[in-house]
């Protein structure tokens, strides 16, 4: 679908020279003299190369149709991580490079949003928070309740994070998937 360059926003996917690019930033520049331009910083989806392009604001750009669908995580194997569409029961294998560091937070039965272009997965969005168990941490030290210091801990998925001093091994905690930071003790 052709759109004018000034209408493109961060997160849109465009097609250029037969390749797909995701827009990292889009800025409309209006110089005092001359025609206004749209500056796009993009990342090529196939290999992650960052590209910067300038278009006249009225220039037509091919915007790729990307479909966001909810999928359920099933399992991981040599092909990648496998997800199922809960409506059609169709399964999709997503390569590890699409998931990236977020793979550590995938749990069986977890609902995620997959961005698909012609049935090919481009990106994945995990829930903001996940509940995990602490498998290793330092013992509780009495008298540290007044300070706001944090201690290192290892989660059940192998990720290291910092937790408050009162958290012990075996405690279930809520973690942010974006940065792996501690949110709160799980309420279950």
From Swiss-Prot:
Keywords, sorted A to Z: Cytoplasm, Elongation factor, Protein biosynthesis
Stored Pfam families: EFP, EFP_N, Elong-fact-P_C
Family: Belongs to the elongation factor P family.
GO cellular component terms, semicolon-separated: cytoplasm
Xref: InterPro entries: Elong-fact-P_C, NA-bd_OB-fold, Rib_uL2_dom2, Transl_elong_fac_P/YeiP, Transl_elong_KOW-like, Transl_elong_P/YeiP_cen, Transl_elong_P/YeiP_CS, Transl_elongation_fac_P
Intracellular or extracellular location(s): Cytoplasm
Molecular-function GO terms, alphabetical: translation elongation factor activity
Transmembrane parts of this sequence: none
Any GO BP annotation: peptide biosynthetic process
Matches recorded under SMART domains: EFP (SM01185), Elong-fact-P_C (SM00841)
Signal sequence segment: none
Function per UniProt: Involved in peptide bond synthesis. Stimulates efficient translation and peptide-bond synthesis on native or reconstituted 70S ribosomes in vitro. Probably functions indirectly by altering the affinity of the ribosome for aminoacyl-tRNA, thus increasing their reactivity as acceptors for peptidyl transferase.
Protein name stated in the entry: Elongation factor P
Functional pathway: Protein biosynthesis; polypeptide chain elongation
PANTHER family from the UniProt entry: ELONGATION FACTOR P, TRANSLATION ELONGATION FACTOR KOW-LIKE DOMAIN-CONTAINING PROTEIN
């Amino acid at each position: 679908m052709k759109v004018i360059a000034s209408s493109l926003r961060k997160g849109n996917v465009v097609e250029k020279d037969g390749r797909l690019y995701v827009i990292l930033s889009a800025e409309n520049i209006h110089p005092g003299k001359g025609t206004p331009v749209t500056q796009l910083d993009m990342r090529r989806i196939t290999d992650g190369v960052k590209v910067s392009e300038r278009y006249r604001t009225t220039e037509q750009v091919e915007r790729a149709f990307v479909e966001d669908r909810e999928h359920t995580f099933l399992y991981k194997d040599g092909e990648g991580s496998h997800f199922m569409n809960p409506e059609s029961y169709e399964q999709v294998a997503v390569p590890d490079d699409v998931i990236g560091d977020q793979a550590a937070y995938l749990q069986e039965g977890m609902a995620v949003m997959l961005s698909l272009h012609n049935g090919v997965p481009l990106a994945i969005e995990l829930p903001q928070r996940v509940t995990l168990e602490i498998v290793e941490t330092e013992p509780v030290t009495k008298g540290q309740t007044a300070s706001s210091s944090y201690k290192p801990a290892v989660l059940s998925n192998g990720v290291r994070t910092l937790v408050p001093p009162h958290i012990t091994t075996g405690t279930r905690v809520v973690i942010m998937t974006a940065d792996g930071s501690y949110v709160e003790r799980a309420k279950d």
